Amino acid sequence: MAKQSSRELALERRKALSNSGKKSTTLNGSSPNRIRTASDARLTRTDQSFVKAGKESVQLTAPKREQLDTSFVASRESSGASRRQVKTIRNSSRELVLARRDELSRRGQPAAKSKDRTRAEVEKISSKVSQQDAAKKQVNDLASDQKGVDESSSKSLKSLDTVSRLSSRNSTSRPSAKRRSIQNPSRALVLARREAQSKHGKTAANQPTSAASVARQGDPDLSSREISQRVRELRSKSGATGKKRSGACRPCGPNRNGSKQAVAADAHWKVGLSETSTGQVVTGTQANRSSKTTGNEASTCRSITGTQYLGSEVFDTFCQSAPQPGQPLKVAVTNTSHGNRVTGNEVGRSEKVTGDEPGTCKTLTGTEYISANQANQYCGVSQPSPRKVGQSVTEDGRKVSGVMVGRSEKVTGDEAGSNRQLTGDQYLGVDPLPEGRSAEKVGSFNTLRGAGVTGTNVARSEYVTGNEPGSCKRVTGDEYVGPQQYNTFCGGKPNPEAAKVGLSLTNKSQTVSGTLTGRSELVTGDEPGTCKAVTGTPYSGVEQASGWCDTNSVREIQDRTPKLLGTPGAVMTGLQPGVGGVMTGAEKGACEPLTGTPYVGGDQLVQACGSDAPAGSNDHQGSSESSPWTHFSVQSPARAMQLQRDPRSGVTGTSYEQGSQITGPFNMAVDKITGTEQFRFDRKQRHFKSVPVEATPNDVSQTRPESRVTGEGQSAGLNITGDDWDRSERVTGTEGASARRRNPTRPGPMSAMPAADLKRNEEVSQPMSRVTGSSGNTDQGSLITVSGGARG
């Protein structure tokens, strides 16, 4: 029993704390007045002998260990002796905690072997663990210095063996069913729930509340047979009260009251709901003034500071008007420009605060924390800021939120494909595209000569300052500014410069681009050979011949240029693998145009196909004798002699001027008489007229007009009278050669020196530069110029 009261112990403890602090020996050690009795003491691992044995087990010698191996009785005696010797326990929990911390500091987390335990597990383990196992663990840790107690240890060993056998038998045998007294089912259910919560905590509340689960929660060691017995016992007493039903039970008895049955009055709510004067909802126990309660009339209609807990219905019922708030709201509710609600301290502009006027109506980026009501009050219009997270709807009606990647008026380069239907995941909403077109990233305009130019527009603009100088001046070199600049800022566009790269059309209707090598008005010395036909690759266009030559020269140049046509070709002689003959099977594809070397003549193709002949089949048929390719371009001596011999027809004797009119023997007829002329290699077939030639009468009176000139001056058989030199009905005179001799005339003015002939070269002004062939030259600078560019 304790010899000191609790007050004396407290005073002693405080005195020790004031003298030596928390390290006082009176605090760590147990006082003699707090000694446990022998009945309270039991063998634990925090026993002093148990701790000392752990330290002395390291100092065991080899002979002592052999004695422990050969004689197991000595170890049992030590356990019995330790149980007899009851000593004082000095703060065993503190020593256990210190030992555990020491092990954790040395070995770390593996030294922590403690686990979470419940009361059910502790009881289950304590019933199964035998005293024999506890004695074996103590033998391995105790020292061998207790040799004088062999007899007592042997007796204790026998008693321990008997106890262990009994405990092992009891553990192996199945526990018999315990008889329980009849209890109230609801009380048993509550007790089982509390017991389960004490063992398993909050997890026990989530378990089902069936009869079997309740029985298992009360005693987890029950077998399935015992649980079924408990369930049957409960159902035999209470029926199906604990069983869940799918629907409500229908009344089975007669309704005696009928329609006169009164509706049960609703009970008073434990948790009330009211609304403050500022529109906030307050829930909880209602502390409002009530007509059924006396003593709460004071200060009902006064304004108070702090949290408002009275509902607005109190002021409407007992007061004439609502109270005026004396201080700003502690938590304000405002709306952003996009309609989102923001709660907290209101940091906007206020009429009672000065110095916060700058930046009131400016749009800020980032999180919007200023109310839209402020913009309406001080600025007049609320300008919504750009959304950080946009919302849209797809074509199927699904909502899409996030960064909007659609087309915008403030972004360039996203115009391509904006109106196309794409496959895959839809990331654009059904919102209409913005009106108007943004600034073009790649501009398109025309030069002064009409050529198209694409790229970044570097011309003068109304939105850019500093680019006014030189906007209306003419610049040589590559033209990169369109006529829009001259029409907008200069009033008109200048004449285009000489083309650096010209375009021309050859005789074969092919386009040639590059530096033009034809005749030019600005170049002298290139007149010879302008209108001559040149064979080979044409490098001059038809426009050169049309501008400087007559029609005959242009036609000759066009005829001289061969046209490389495919099928059909020119008229061919010899064996032709053509179509339209006696061979069958050649009709397929005969009238289709082919490329390559022509092996079918145009005459044969026209004869076989008719109107289905390809285009250009008659081009070779129109060649005449005057065409350039029908004559030799070089006159050899033999060719010259042949041309002289043909018109003279030096061979006589067989054909005459009118051979068909000659009569005589048959062998002198045409093509029947052989001779030198018919054996010539280059003879030409003569065509004789077989029809008689009609003689034309020479009637002068019908062809010559009637003359009215009479007199002696008549020289042509007519008599001319009068003095008139012109033929008239009333004038007569001389006419003829005599009249011309009598009246000589001059065709024009005569001078001693002949008149100078006007030539074209005198009309052309003298060029400033001695180098010709390019444009943009001056009389200063280098004499060598780059075609199409500035002098350098």
From Swiss-Prot:
Q: Does the keyword Chloroplast apply?
A: no
Tell me the ranges holding the C-repeat repeats: 633-678, 703-738
Q: Where is this region: Middle region?
A: 240-615
Ordered alphabetically, the record's keywords are:
Bacterial microcompartment, Carbon dioxide fixation, Carboxysome, Repeat
Q: Which Pfam families match?
A: CsoS2_M
Q: How is it modified after translation?
A: Has been suggested to undergo ribosomal frameshifting, as does its ortholog in H.neapolitanus. The exact position of the putative frameshift is not given, but it would probably occur in the sixth M-repeat and remove the C-terminus.
Q: Name one GO biological process term.
A: carbon fixation
Q: Where is this region: C-terminal peptide (CTP)?
A: 763-792
Query: Region annotation C-terminal domain: residue ranges?
Result: 616-792
Name-wise, this protein is: Carboxysome assembly protein CsoS2
Organism name: Prochlorococcus marinus (strain MIT 9313)
Per UniProt, what is the name of the gene that codes for the protein in this document?
csoS2
